[in-house]
C-alpha cells in the first residue's frame, strides 16, 4: 500500500503544482513551465548522452518531446514523494504541512544546481534574462509542491 500512497501523493502534488501555474499565469501573465523543453533535453540525453544542453530553444523540435516532458515532470514528482516517504521512514520528516514546506524549500536546490544547468540556463538561472525571477518562481513552486506532499502524506496518516 505504501507504494500506492507514494504514487498518489506524487501525482496529486504535481497536479496542484500544474494547476497553480495556470492560476499564476492568469494573475501575472508569467507562462507556466515549458515541459516540451524538458522533453527535448531528456530525448537529447537518451539519444546523444548530452547532459548539459546548449541553446535548447533553438534546437529542432523532437518527436513527442512534449509528452516526454510531461512524463519526466510527473516521474520526478513521484521521485520527490518517494524521497519524502523515505525521510518519513527515517523519522527525519513528519507527514505535515511544515515539514512538507521545509522539504520543498530544500528541494529547490535540484532545479537551481541540476535542472537549470542541464537545460542550458546555468546555475541559479544565471544565463536567463531575469535570474532572480526564475529562482523566485522555482522557490515558490517547490514550496507549494513540498507542502502538498507533506499534506498528502498526512491524509494517509493513521
Regions found by a protein language model. Give the residues of each.
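Juxtamembrane/disordered regions of integral membrane proteins
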Residues: 1-158
Amino acid at each position: 500500500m505504501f507504494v500506492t500512497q507514494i504514487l498518489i501523493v506524487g501525482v496529486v502534488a504535481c497536479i496542484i503544482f500544474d494547476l497553480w501555474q495556470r492560476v499564476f499565469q492568469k494573475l501575472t501573465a508569467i507562462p507556466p513551465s515549458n515541459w516540451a523543453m524538458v522533453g527535448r533535453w531528456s530525448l537529447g540525453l537518451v539519444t546523444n548522452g548530452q547532459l548539459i544542453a546548449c541553446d535548447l530553444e533553438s534546437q529542432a523540435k523532437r518527436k513527442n518531446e512534449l509528452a516526454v516532458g510531461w512524463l519526466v515532470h510527473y516521474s520526478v514528482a513521484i521521485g520527490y514523494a518517494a524521497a519524502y516517504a523515505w525521510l518519513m521512514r527515517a523519522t527525519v520528516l513528519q507527514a505535515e504541512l511544515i515539514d512538507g514546506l521545509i522539504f520543498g524549500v530544500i528541494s529547490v536546490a535540484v532545479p537551481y544546481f541540476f535542472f537549470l544547468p542541464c537545460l542550458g540556463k546555468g546555475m541559479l538561472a544565471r544565463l536567463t534574462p531575469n535570474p532572480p525571477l526564475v529562482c523566485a518562481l522555482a522557490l515558490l513552486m517547490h514550496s507549494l509542491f513540498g507542502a502538498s506532499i507533506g499534506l498528502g502524506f498526512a491524509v494517509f496518516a493513521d
